[in-house]
């Protein structure tokens, strides 16, 4: 580490209780989660530019998912409260962020994330997930970029405008495949990546703030959730206005 560079390493171990029951009506064991992470942060140009990078691995020893079959092993399960512990999942990822000030009034924020989440050490019995298969609804890459301008002239002091773009990469919808499944072929559905753009404007006067945002400017159509029982599209173009007062 130097005056402009900082590094860190961390490890955490935690558990998450799982709701629902297994196919025999028993409560589910907790999920044990281990996270390892190392990262670094650096500043350039006398603090006007900041860059950071982090590399991590997250393992979940007991991922709970809706059971594919009931206790007889042949009847499809349609009850989302009946679940199975699918075995271990592992997520390896990298996060990069670059933020900076271009002028007294203009600044930007950017970020990119890569994530590879897949099943590891599954049970191997009928209905269990397949080692190495990526989890559905887990994009490999996401990115964001925002540019903001803050007015400083006497006539416009307190006004701020901005534009932001958000990218969600390709991923799979549907359901993950299981050992011994009856359906032929794959149950996973390939979903394309998509980008949305937001515009924003705000005004602050003492303790009063007014914010206006036009989200999904180009009315992009894609899906947040896509499985056998529901298809949830991303929010369409919308105008959001909020007012707040700070006590």
Model-derived regions, located:
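Gram-negative outer-membrane beta-barrel transporters
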Residues: 84-176, 242-246
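Membrane-embedded beta-barrel scaffold of Gram-negative outer-membrane proteins
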Residues: 6-10, 31-101, 108, 113, ...
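Solvent-exposed loop segments that connect transmembrane elements
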Residues: 19-26, 62-84, 119-136, 172-189
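Residues that define the transmembrane beta-barrel architecture of outer-membrane proteins
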Residues: 32-36, 90-92, 139-143, 193-197, ...
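Transmembrane beta-barrel strands of outer-membrane/channel proteins
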Residues: 9-13, 40, 51-57, 110-114, ...
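Residue-level signature of outer-membrane beta-barrel architecture
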Residues: 1, 40-44, 100-101, 149-151, ...
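Repeated loop/turn-to-beta-strand initiation elements of outer-membrane beta-barrel proteins
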Residues: 4-7, 46-51, 105-108, 154-159, ...
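C-terminal beta-signal and adjacent terminal beta-strands/loops
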Residues: 59, 166-183, 202-247
